């Protein structure tokens, strides 16, 4: 067995004993094996031979080196340039292809590393004359500083932050200065010839008025009409120039907001009646009035449509397509809006009918065989939808309308007419054949009260239920009952209104003499529904008519209360006795017996024969006709037409109910309808359609209902007192009737509110002061009722 020769390994894996070492280092040490070993001993071969001597005796056991041997090794630590090249080749072979990029720059890196190694060799080749055996004592450890307080730490932190901010500021200044040096000074600002300014306090009188008018028109709604109308009259329209600009603003608003055209037409009528006339700018010319300037604007807009149409047709370029569409849309809005405004002005008696016929002839054209433009056909349909009913009321205009509609029927058969226009013309013909009653409700501007009333009808709620929601009476939450009140509300006694301990709430069902539930409505007085209130027990049955209930809104299991019944035969509570109807003369008070226990067959309420004989039956459908004509009057406010409709009813015994319904509807709509209400009642009294007894009984009817109505309409007592006072001033109502109206209600709060409003309105007029002084006894009696 041969013994392996000890070979010193200067690198990992070196030596000749292993396959790795032979593969990697055999080529690299081939030079040394050939006998040229001077590259390992630059300082001579003596030291190297000594190293070889002790390496020959080296075994595989642990080797211990003496101090002298280590010092001998230090003498051969100089690394030559050839060894460094070998190092690079070995590392490249170890790392493989990943380090192939190193070889491309091997020359540059080799030079850099060579310089670094030479500097390190120069430092280590110097003779070290220090005494390694002598040990110097370590310097004493510095004393441990005392623990820093939080204040000291905070001060150091603040100083550090301050220095950082200063350094950042200096860097920013240096950066900005360098940028300025590179870019140069910023460009100078270009000032406009006429710079914008707020011009506060420098407005002219005309600009100030126009600015005020614009603000008023932007806030104008049917509910705020009366208030803003007064502000517009007081805005300062003092010259003809200002008047023309104001009319232009109103015209533009009305044209682009056709839904509000009725409101703007009414505004124009009010301004025409109240604004002054101005002298003509030309000698011998006509006066400048609101009506003349407004009609000139309408005429110019109507006649200028052809020039706009030609201008739009000239836009044929591909880049003008968007502009053409915008102008077509604006042209259509202006045309239809102008036609709608002219129609509404006709309703306000500001446009004569001859102008209307001239417009229709212009739109239809003289040639019956030619097909009008689509815009003209749509304008004709819009025109007749607005004023067709009013034109047909005049026999002469109706004959002219017949010729128009003959032309329209021929137009439907024209193949050149577009399908859309054909359907519009057919709808117009059907509308006239149906007496101008539309199939769908017309979309128009409404007040908040009208919106709530419509919602109550659609949902089957008790009248005024939405007012309770607005006032927060259902704040605790929970489902709503058909009367508009919370089912889970404390104190209501649950779902069953007749349970013991339940509170009587407005709108809850009452009980008749046989313990049958009777659904109460706003028109029913408080207490027992069969209990008389003076002369009120004999009034129209609509007072006691239950309000409709939508069965879909009721909880499950309650359908039997309002559905078909084997006992009743019909849905709902039992009908009231037929003898309880409207009567022109009050009946004596009747006492009601105590409630009888409920039985399978409800007993009829005994009514005296005298009451049955004196009762008169009201024609069916009279209530709906009354509500319809009152709604129409408050919409158009034409007194003669309202008078004609009431006279056509031919029911003088129903006049007190009409008075009551008129007051109820007007006060429910708001304070702006008090004046039209008083004008209507005064007009009907002056024309002898209504008598003094009709007005007194109607006010008495409404006064008996005010305790229920006042819950939803807190201002109703004050407004009702104003109506009474104004009727007294017009001699339509006797002052003694005030005492009877106050006695019809039990709540002293409502009595006081009504009488205070009556006296306040009368004291503001000299004639009213004379009435109060001449009826001192009645005033004292009314004061005692209000305490």
UniProtKB/Swiss-Prot annotation:
The keyword Protein biosynthesis applies. Residues 621-743 form the MI domain. Keywords: Initiation factor, Protein biosynthesis, Translation regulation. Residues 112-121, 588-604 have a biased composition (Low complexity). Pfam families: MA3, MIF4G. One of its GO terms (cellular component) is eukaryotic translation initiation factor 4F complex. PROSITE patterns: MI. Coiled coil: none annotated. GO terms for biological process: regulation of translation; translational initiation. Residues 1-20, 112-196, 514-607 are annotated as: Disordered. Belongs to the eukaryotic initiation factor 4G family. Residues 125-138, 145-158 have a biased composition (Basic and acidic residues). Residues 160-181, 532-547 have a biased composition (Polar residues). EIF4F is a multi-subunit complex, the composition of which varies with external and internal environmental conditions. It is composed of at least EIF4A, EIF4E and EIF4G. In higher plants two isoforms of EIF4F have been identified, named isoform EIF4F and isoform EIF(iso)4F. Isoform EIF4F has subunits p220 and p26, whereas isoform EIF(iso)4F has subunits p82 and p28. Two forms of p82 have been identified, p82-34 and p82-16. SMART domains: MA3 (SM00544), MIF4G (SM00543). GO terms for molecular function: mRNA binding; translation initiation factor activity. It comes from Triticum aestivum. Residues 210-435 form the MIF4G domain. This is Eukaryotic translation initiation factor isoform 4G-2. The keyword Glycoprotein does not apply.
